[in-house]
Amino acid sequence: MKLNQFARLTPDFKVQVAELKQIGLQADPDDAFSQSATDLFNAFFPEAYTLAAKEDKLAQVAVNMDQTLAAWLAKKPSKMTRRDFYNVALQLLGFEAFTDFDLNDPFKMMTATKLPSLDHDLTSTADLLKAVYLLLNTRTKHLVSYLDDLANRGFLKDFQKKQKKPTHLLFNGKVQQVFDARQAVREVVWIESDMDTDHDGQRDLLEATIYRPKATDQGLKVPVLFTANPYFHGTNDVTAVTHVPETTLAVKTHGASKAEVTANPEEPANLPHHPVNGEATQAEAYAEENSMYAFNDYFLARGFAVVYSAGVGTRYSDGFRTTGGPEETDGAVAVIEWLTGKRRAFTNRTDGITIKAWWSTGLVAMTGKSYLATLAMAAATTGVDGLKTIVADAGISSWYDYYRENGLVVAPGGFQGEDADVLAVDTFSRQKSGGDLINIKQAWEKHLATITHDQDRTTGAYNTWWDARNYRKNANKVKADVVLIHGLNDWNVKPTNAIKFWEAIADLPIQKKLVLHQGQHVYVHNVRSLDFLDMMNLWLTHELLGEANGAEDVLPNVVVQDNVAVQTWSAYQNFASPAAEHVTNTRNLKTDFEAATDQFTDHATATFNAQHDTSASFETAIITPNSAYANSRLWLTQPPLERDQTLEGIPHLELTLAIDAPTGILSVRLIDLGMAKRFGETAATVALNGLQLGFDYKTTDILEFKPTAKPTPSKLISLGHINLQNPKNAYEVQRITPGQPFHISLDLQPTHYHLPAGRQLALVIHGADMAQTIRPIKTTHYQIDLANSSITLPYRI
């Protein structure tokens, strides 16, 4: 086990003492050592209400092989050895003596686990207080810090009773859980937008669900975590509308210019406002939906309000879904504008009674994963005031990069046949309310048909519809600080979405952080080896509470999880830069790779059907050395590595080839070859319900990325797809003369990948990708000019 920690601060001793006192501990350096030790260790069992109960708890802790903590304290000690203190500390952190560590040498385990410690014996009360302060900021076996663990057991439950008025509590630069999340005020309002997406002549009203600390009713104003979540009110069965992958790849006869595919913002319609008949300070509707994001729940107990809005076309709101269109961005912005006092909302949909977010400080962070993170990124590119930061996990920065690639229809990994129209149906939760649907069904079906037409599955080309959903075009407007989190094995929302957005905001005068993990499309806030919750606590305390805690400097610019060394996260200055830390090597496919042939015929669709494969089984088979698809691919290998190497950046392919057809699909996979137990792409549960989100409150599982039980022969590092008629970009078209050579350039997905010595790099070049592209039934023959083809590989040195 490794408990990496990036968010721990080390303030000077005076600050440490003041903070210890602030949380209710006896922390006077002039007190006698024995009395201070007794007071402090007793305080660490808040679940024990009496001295007798605390004595029993102390007796359960071993100081060394000869004494319990109760017996040691009874002797009124005047000092404590470093070893004895950390024997006690480890047990307080949830580790077991004799099982997890040796009482004669706790430091062996602490070093392996990356736990901090003082380097000397405790010979004064000041030493004891320093050790206790560090202990409170040390991570437990249950992922959270020790102070968090104490608070989860009731240590801070009476904090507000001792205050003249409700307030936030900061410790080590981070806000603490001194609010009872169980008592949160739950309410619903309807925010008036500027849009009419369902074409009924009225401004769409957007439902927003609010959970705010009860202390706001006593005058406390709080910042807001806002999650734009299209799934919040449920999803629909999309089996009937999911596309069957087409069997014919269309020959493109004409392309377009950049000007022709550039979307121009539409002028907002001059719509009448909803009438206003009064103002209220109390909502009329209870929030019946439960908060569904553990990250937000964690901060609710720390004095942040949490707001969810599903947006246009969802249950209890007006409008139609547009799958990432400007209307969905505007819907998210409308919520922020209400939270900052710049837009009206109503207590219900009919009476015209307005309500303000009087409890809000007007400082907002947007959070969430996938579609939720996408809308956070979209809102940030508007430059809306009040949005201080986004914490965007696996977000889409351009919808073309989600459903298309280089002129091809390319489904997100795991969702073959999905497209923008399918997702629109999936999230159109208005249809769950029959009384609502009967009035809009015909208009919705007409609207949906427009999406199906405009997404253009026939050519897969980039057009104005996709351009309107490319948020990177407006990245220069971003004013909010940005945290991006992405899985390096996320083939659903592929890594290019994060890295291209990261590059687009690189020169902006904002703070920005990037976290890359080895998972697929998953969260990392409950991954034990990373102190992600503390990192974001430090970040949000700075961003939303204005605390000068140095978060922008303390937190690394880039944190990357290693794919070989378990539970290892490394800090870097940037991704794929600076130049002094990176090198690119261009390798010729003929002289630097071994290949049995330079040609293949793509029979993948026939093989797929004959093998009764699925998308998942195909993805395994296509990168397996001995495979049913061996004759439908080109397999190139490099010699085994003599030393460890780390790929970091965007692999780039230059390929000269000829095909026997006027169009074709080319897929490329970069492979780690060699039998090994590699990390699973989904973190395994290590403690069911082990992460507590607040005192007597919700829990979630603690996870960890682990090597698989059985070795595998290969693993996908990166991949890419291209329509061979689109060698330059996704809108200009090249005519292909069958049998005549031509050249293409192809970027693969960004990666950070540790290749151990002895492994081999392999390059798989094939045609249709059964898991992601369409599935043509016509076979195509590919002839690769290996001598005039190369791959450029970026390395961190």
UniProtKB/Swiss-Prot annotation:
Gene Ontology molecular functions:
aminopeptidase activity; dipeptidyl-peptidase activity; serine-type peptidase activity
Q: Where is the active site?
A: S370, D490, H521
Give the signal sequence positions: none
Under Enzyme Commission nomenclature, its number is 3.4.14.11
**Where, subcellularly, is it found?**
Cytoplasm
Q: Do you know which InterPro entries this protein is assigned to?
A: AB_hydrolase_fold (IPR029058), Galactose-bd-like_sf (IPR008979), Pept_S15_Xpro (IPR008252), PepX_N_dom (IPR015251), PepX_N_dom_sf (IPR036313), Xaa-Pro-like_dom (IPR000383), Xaa-Pro_dipept_C (IPR013736)
Biological processes annotated in GO: proteolysis
Gene Ontology cellular-component annotations: cytoplasm
Keywords, A to Z, come to: Aminopeptidase, Cytoplasm, Hydrolase, Protease, Serine protease
Q: Which Pfam families match?
A: Peptidase_S15 (PF02129), PepX_C (PF08530), PepX_N (PF09168)
Explain the purpose of this protein: Removes N-terminal dipeptides sequentially from polypeptides having unsubstituted N-termini provided that the penultimate residue is proline.
- What does the subunit comment say? Homodimer.
The molecule here is called Xaa-Pro dipeptidyl-peptidase
Native species:
Lacticaseibacillus casei (strain BL23) (Lactobacillus casei)
> What gene name does this entry carry?
pepX
